[in-house]
């Protein structure tokens, strides 16, 4: 009899717990708010390519909570230039002014749906916002940002901690990236010495890159960049007798660069 009683009690407890879990799953567990993905970190980074044409990237507006949206949400956003100054003064010092973020000129980008982005509840809890950018004239040593802020929404409140952010542009091209340098140096009257060193090749344009040559260490300081780097311009001319060797201009001198499995040999 006791065993039967225990089984009945356990069964009732199981049913009660299952019922509670079901009720919890059917109710919103958090405050449902509209926010920008990346805003909690203040800065959201997106990669964009150097191009002579307009390039497209995206950022995302989304909703928090455990349940799906029950209606469409219209989100109105704006560009807030003050965010850039606020960030620079808070996170950089006067000594780092050359590293300050710079607001991208408005004539170099457009956000067609900035003032009317719709999160369609039938399609999910977020919506991508396209950004069209002209990158050809941008400088690799300048940190460009687009300061965006949610101004108003319909149906749900705006997240107080996730409604504004800086979109930081990370520039790239077909040749930029990390490489392993292999080479040798020869001083007059001495035996050649082999040198190997990992290198980061930075883009400076559509077909141009910059690197610290020889054993020079990489640096973000202007003086080091001026004295320790070379700039390569990769042309469309193929070296005679080869299939994949392109001619490269190095400070008004000509050289060649061989591409093989994403590795360049100078």
What are these regions (language model features)?
Residues 10-14, 251:
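Generic signature of intrinsically disordered, low-complexity, basic-rich segments
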Residues 3-10:
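Sec-dependent signal peptide recognition
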Residues 15-19:
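C-terminal motif of bacterial Sec signal peptides marking the signal peptidase cleavage site
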Residues 21-118, 126-266:
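Intrinsically disordered, low-complexity regulatory regions in eukaryotic proteins
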């Amino acid at each position: 009899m006791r065993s039967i009683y225990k089984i009945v009690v356990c069964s009732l407890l199981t049913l009660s717990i299952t019922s509670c879990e079901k009720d919890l799953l059917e109710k919103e567990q958090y405050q449902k708010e509209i926010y920008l993905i990346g805003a909690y970190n203040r800065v959201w980074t997106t990669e964009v390519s150097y191009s002579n044409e307009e390039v497209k990237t995206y950022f995302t507006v989304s909703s928090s909570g455990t349940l799906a949206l029950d209606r469409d949400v219209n989100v109105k956003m704006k560009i807030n230039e003050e965010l850039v100054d606020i960030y620079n003064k808070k996170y950089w010092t006067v000594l780092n002014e050359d590293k300050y973020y710079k607001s991208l000129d408005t004539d170099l980008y457009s956000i067609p749906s900035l003032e009317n982005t719709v999160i369609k509840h039938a399609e999910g809890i977020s919506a991508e916002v396209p950004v069209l950018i002209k990158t050809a004239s941008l400088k690799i040593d300048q940190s460009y940002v687009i300061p965006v802020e949610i101004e108003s929404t319909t149906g749900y409140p705006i997240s107080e901690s996730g409604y504004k952010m800086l979109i930081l542009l990370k520039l790239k091209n077909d040749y930029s990236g990390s490489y392993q340098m292999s080479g040798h140096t020869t001083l007059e009257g001495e035996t050649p010495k082999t040198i190997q060193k990992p290198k980061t090749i930075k883009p400076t344009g559509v077909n141009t890159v910059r690197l610290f040559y020889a054993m020079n260490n990489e640096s973000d300081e202007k003086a080091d960049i001026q004295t320790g780097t070379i700039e390569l311009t990769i042309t469309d001319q193929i070296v005679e007798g080869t299939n994949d060797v392109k001619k490269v201009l190095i400070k008004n001198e000509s050289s060649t660069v061989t591409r093989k499995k994403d590795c360049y040999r100078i």
